[in-house]
Amino acid sequence: MKNNRTLGLAILSLLLFIGNAPLAAKVKNYTLSSPDGGLKVEISTGDGLSYRIMHGNDTILSHSNIGLVLADGTLVGKSSRVTRERRKKIEDKVESPFYRFKEFIAACNELDLKLQGGFGVTFRAYDDGVAYRFYTTVASEVTVKDEMAEFNFPQDYTAYLPYTTNDKKPMAMAFQNVYDITPLSKAQPKLAFLPV
């Protein structure tokens, strides 16, 4: 009788484990809009971490994967389970002594997704752009070995690219150059600098 009960509990535990396994990779979508509502970011979590950017009804950037590879082999963003979601509106007054205005307001909406394992990602949607950054709450030192940042454009847009003028030391330059006007598919595999 005792063996049957133990066997029954083992089978029940296995069924519960198998039944809940798909929940770990369940895809969940989060939406964040700019203050004026013109830009929208859709963040998807589950098997991976990706985002998509919309302007009105137009897709500007198709779902693009993001993540980090740590020195110990941990993949931040892979099988991402959100443990906390926080939203806030931000209006920062930025002093700009060398700009044509003395100061300006940087307004955005922010979505902070804390991920299981002591990491998180914060997205910001401004009226004229979108940004994200990873962070950690791990107390020990963390070494990032690589970053995954895909940019999947829905079509072959025209790009205005100012390439570096120093191929041997691409960051050792005056950051001044003419713009190469080209479809994204024809962009050169070398460093281009802002503004793009």
Regions found by a protein language model. Give the residues of each.
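Sec/Tat signal peptide C-region and signal peptidase I cleavage site
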Residues: 20-24
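Bacterial N-terminal signal peptides
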Residues: 10-19
